[in-house]
């Protein structure tokens, strides 16, 4: 029993460490994306092409947190379901919105099944983006890879730390 409990505790600690958000409050928006990519590459050994063009240096903390979590979950999904094949992230700004695109060349899936059991990551990403007044879409089809696209407004209120 003691060994089983130690093993379970080790497993729970590993999960909890993945839930903790790194300190991104002082990072620029680009550095936040770079941090998400670097963390992913270190954990998986997979490389990600990151293209950052014309984004503001800074953004409200809720936008940085949502961006980080969106990138983290998108890359993790790609790794789990598509072996991290040809992953690419594009970040740009247009009309006061941060546009995030995460693509892979994996096997793809039918987006109509996004809200069924086992697709909680996609639903969680959508909720995070929509809470900030943004939009979220998934483009995919069997055998053709997947693109996750989010538009986040860059003018959201800052959250006071307690």
Which residues fall in each region the model found?
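Coiled-coil dimerization/phosphotransfer module
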Residues: 1-162
């Amino acid at each position: 029993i003691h060994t089983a409990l130690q093993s379970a505790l080790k497993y729970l600690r590993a999960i909890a460490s993945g839930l903790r958000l790194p300190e991104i409050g002082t990072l620029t928006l680009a550095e936040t994306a770079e941090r998400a990519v670097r963390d992913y590459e270190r954990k998986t050994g997979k490389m990600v092409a990151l293209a950052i063009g014309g984004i503001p240096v800074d953004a409200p903390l809720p936008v940085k947190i949502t961006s980080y979590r969106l990138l983290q979950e998108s890359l993790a999904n790609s790794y789990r379901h598509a072996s991290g094949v040809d992953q690419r992230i594009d970040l740009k700004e247009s009309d006061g919105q941060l546009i995030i695109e995460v693509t892979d060349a994996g096997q793809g899936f039918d987006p109509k099944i996004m809200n069924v059991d086992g697709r909680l990551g996609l639903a969680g990403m959508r909720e995070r983006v929509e809470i900030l007044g943004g939009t979220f879409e998934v483009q995919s089809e069997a055998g053709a890879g997947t693109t996750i696209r989010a538009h986040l407004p860059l003018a959201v209120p800052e959250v006071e730390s307690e």
